[in-house]
């Protein structure tokens, strides 16, 4: 059911600044993209085997604003795995006891594909995102 690692998200106060070290190492770095519906600005770093997503709060009401406030230098926020069928994956994970965050319905994520998040307490302290590919 769960496929490959799509990305690791790191919450930071300034996404473009955080990505610069990767650009200096030769990685491909995207432009900053505001996602008002998610309350974040994203910058993706493409690596040979996965991506790093830097997420920056977009306004004080951002869902990651408190995380960045507590972790002023930034920190790992979530990991994202690919799935073929997000609804089937949701049902299988729920049947195993995992709790879906939000209203339980997929939202369109940063890649324009459906995503869901699952409670960190059900994944050994890691916030998990699944993305339909």
Where do the model's predicted regions map?
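A cross-kingdom feature marking solvent-exposed beta-strand/loop segments within repeated
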Residues: 5-6, 25, 30-39, 59-71, ...
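Short loop/beta submotifs within extracellular cysteine-rich repeat domains
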Residues: 17-20, 28, 52, 62-63, ...
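Conserved active-site tyrosine of GNAT-family acetyltransferases
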Residues: 18-23, 93
């Amino acid at each position: 059911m769960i496929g490959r690692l799509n990305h690791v998200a790191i919450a930071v106060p300034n996404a473009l600044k955080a990505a610069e070290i990767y650009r200096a190492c030769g990685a491909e770095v995207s432009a900053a993209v505001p996602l008002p519906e998610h309350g974040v600005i994203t910058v993706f770093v493409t690596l040979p085997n996965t991506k790093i997503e830097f997420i920056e709060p977009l306004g004080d009401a951002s869902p990651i604003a408190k995380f960045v406030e507590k972790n002023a230098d930034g920190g790992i926020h979530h990991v994202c795995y690919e799935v073929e069928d997000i609804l089937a994956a949701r049902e299988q994970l729920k049947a195993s006891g995992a709790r879906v965050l939000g209203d339980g319905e997929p939202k369109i994520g940063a890649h324009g594909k459906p995503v869901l998040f699952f409670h960190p307490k059900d994944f050994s302290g890691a916030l998990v995102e699944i993305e339909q590919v």
